[in-house]
């Protein structure tokens, strides 16, 4: 009869105790801020990456690279300053995550693997790549996994490729390979190119960015399925930063940012075959030193990156001052007679006059473009107009807009330019027929040559060679002018 009231009393007492504890807890310390809140409070986004053409490197105009550009945009979205540090190897990269005052994000072209899942947490994917077995031109080409047996194979320590080969050993116990934490992808490709090792395994995007430096390397076959690149964060206390990263990457995919970055860094990397790469490497050693000072002076005088001028000159004439085409354009920068007169060039075969005139003409074109065209597209449009003329370029922009594409984005206009050679299209334009595929080819090649010149003239590479056999890309002679030339 009295049991129910007793239970009620005990319940009331228990609730009172719980309430008291909650009140006491409320009088204690503030809840710990989330990882994202801590990052924002510090005012900077600390990112660790790798030093390579496909990720991040410094040239005379500052930091560049696919991963750097993407991380910079993320920092800007958060209203933070970007602080970059580079890791000596992949093990140290992952080890640095989560340290006090260390990086909070790894943006380094990383593939998620079972082993790495114990070291970090990964974002949604942003780039697809394929792991590829690389061999040396002239050697027997492997075509299947069994062909790897008995070969000297070297890969990066701590890489997804090392894990992939370990997994392959379960099927092929005789397989042997080595790992090193003292090399980068560039070193692996150089070692294959020079015959120091038989094979390596790298991702397709890394090969695409670097193959031109090593004309002897070839893809043997794809090993396994396509992988996806992701950013990584430390296995922290909450998901706030990771969720913000995922949202940023998904927005970047939806609004075209990722596609534009892919086009900028990878949309032109496959334009040089073996012959083109080999020839360019030779001409860098044998021809560029004669004209480098002229390119630097013209770049400085016209506020153009001298390496862009040099890339244009190579595409136009292979750095030959006496070059002449069947259409009458002449000289190192291949100027028409009318253009030469308009920029004060009296002798198109004089290399200094030609380079100076080409620089002035390019600046004129660049300045005349509509304000709606922003960098870096503005430079690509100026290159196209340099090649095909501003009128034809404007025709292509109008056709692009009519197709519902963006007339201010090179990645859209380059798709339409070849139509200027087709009657059904050029008959609708003001300036008529043009070989519209040529400016697309011109821009793509100039961009590739410019990329190479930018990479090999890094301060840490100047005066050195990428390889020892005399056919690869030399550093630029330190005895020539050393002023920093700002880009357009």
Curated annotation (Swiss-Prot):
Protein's name in the database: Membrane-bound lytic murein transglycosylase F
UniProt keyword annotation of Protein biosynthesis present: no
Catalytic residues (positions): 316
Subcellular location per the Swiss-Prot or TrEMBL entry: Cell outer membrane
InterPro entries: Lysozyme-like_dom_sf (IPR023346), MltF (IPR023703), Solute-binding_3/MltF_N (IPR001638), Transglyc_AS (IPR000189), Transglycosylase_SLT_dom_1 (IPR008258)
SMART domains noted in UniProt: PBPb
Keywords attached to this entry: Cell outer membrane, Cell wall biogenesis/degradation, Lyase, Membrane, Signal
Domain free text: The N-terminal domain does not have lytic activity and probably modulates enzymatic activity. The C-terminal domain is the catalytic active domain.
Catalysed reactions, semicolon-separated: Exolytic cleavage of the (1->4)-beta-glycosidic linkage between N-acetylmuramic acid (MurNAc) and N-acetylglucosamine (GlcNAc) residues in peptidoglycan, from either the reducing or the non-reducing ends of the peptidoglycan chains, with concomitant formation of a 1,6-anhydrobond in the MurNAc residue
CDD domains: MLTF-like (cd13403), PBP2_YfhD_N (cd01009)
Main enzyme class: lyase
Chain's role: Murein-degrading enzyme that degrades murein glycan strands and insoluble, high-molecular weight murein sacculi, with the concomitant formation of a 1,6-anhydromuramoyl product. Lytic transglycosylases (LTs) play an integral role in the metabolism of the peptidoglycan (PG) sacculus. Their lytic action creates space within the PG sacculus to allow for its expansion as well as for the insertion of various structures such as secretion systems and flagella.
Membrane topology term: Peripheral membrane protein
Signal peptide segment: 1-25
GO process annotations (BP): cell wall macromolecule catabolic process; cell wall organization; peptidoglycan catabolic process
Gene Ontology, cellular component aspect: cell outer membrane
Keyword tRNA processing: no
SUPFAM superfamilies, per database record: Lysozyme-like, Periplasmic binding protein-like II
Molecular-function GO term, any one: peptidoglycan lytic transglycosylase activity
UniProt similarity note: In the N-terminal section; belongs to the bacterial solute-binding protein 3 family.
Region of interest called LT domain, as start-end residue ranges on this chain: 270-488
Domain of life: Bacteria
Region of interest called Non-LT domain, as start-end residue ranges on this chain: 26-269
Organism this protein belongs to: Ectopseudomonas mendocina (strain ymp)
EC identifiers of the protein: 4.2.2.n1
């Amino acid at each position: 009869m009295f049991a129910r009231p007793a239970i009620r009393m005990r319940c009331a007492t228990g609730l009172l105790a719980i309430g008291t504890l909650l009140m006491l807890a409320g009088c204690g310390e503030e809840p710990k801020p989330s990882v994202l809140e801590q990052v924002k409070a510090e005012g900077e986004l600390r990112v660790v990456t790798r030093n390579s053409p496909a990720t991040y490197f410094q040239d005379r105009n500052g930091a560049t690279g696919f991963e750097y550009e993407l991380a910079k945009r993320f920092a800007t979205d958060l209203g933070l300053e970007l602080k970059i540090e580079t890791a000596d190897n992949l093990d140290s990269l992952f080890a640095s995550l989560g340290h006090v005052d260390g990086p909070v994000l790894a943006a380094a072209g990383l593939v998620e693997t079972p082993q790495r899942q114990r070291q970090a947490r990964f974002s949604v994917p942003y780039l697809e790549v394929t792991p590829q077995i690389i061999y040396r031109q002239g050697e027997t080409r492997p075509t299947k996994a069994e062909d790897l047996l008995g070969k000297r194979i070297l890969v990066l320590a701590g890489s997804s490729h090392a894990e992939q080969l370990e997994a392959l050993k379960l099927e092929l116990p005789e397989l042997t390979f080595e790992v090193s934490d003292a090399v980068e992808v560039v070193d692996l490709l150089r070692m294959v190119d020079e015959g120091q090792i038989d094979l390596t395994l790298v991702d397709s995007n890394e090969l695409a960015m670097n193959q031109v430096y090593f004309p002897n390397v070839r893809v043997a076959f794809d090993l396994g399925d396509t992988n996806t690149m992701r950013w990584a964060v430390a296995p922290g206390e909450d998901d706030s930063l990771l969720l913000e990263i995922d949202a940023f990457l998904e927005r970047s995919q939806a609004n075209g940012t990722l596609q534009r970055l892919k086009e900028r860094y990878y949309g032109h990397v496959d334009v040089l075959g073996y012959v083109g790469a080999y020839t360019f490497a030779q001409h860098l050693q044998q021809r560029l030193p004669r004209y480098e000072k002229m390119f630097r002076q013209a770049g400085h005088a016209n506020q153009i990156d001298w390496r862009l001028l040099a890339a244009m000159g190579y595409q136009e004439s292979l750095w030959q001052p006496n070059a002449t085409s069947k259409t009458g354009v002449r000289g190192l920068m291949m100027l028409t007679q009318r253009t030469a007169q308009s920029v004060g060039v009296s002798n198109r075969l004089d290399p200094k006059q030609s380079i100076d005139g080409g620089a002035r003409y390019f600046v004129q074109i660049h300045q005349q473009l509509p304000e709606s065209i922003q960098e870096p597209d503005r430079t690509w449009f100026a290159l196209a107009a340099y090649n095909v003329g501003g009128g034809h370029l404007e025709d292509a922009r109008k056709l692009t807009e009519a197709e519902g594409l963006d007339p201010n984005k090179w990645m859209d206009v380059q798709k339409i330019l070849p139509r200027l050679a087709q009657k059904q299209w050029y008959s609708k334009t003001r300036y008529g027929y043009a070989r519209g595929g040529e400016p697309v080819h011109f821009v793509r090649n100039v961009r590739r040559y410019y990329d190479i010149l930018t990479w090999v003239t890094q301060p840490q590479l100047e005066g050195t060679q990428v390889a020892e056999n005399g056919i690869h890309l030399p550093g630029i002679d330190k005895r020539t002018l050393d002023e920093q030339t700002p880009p357009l």
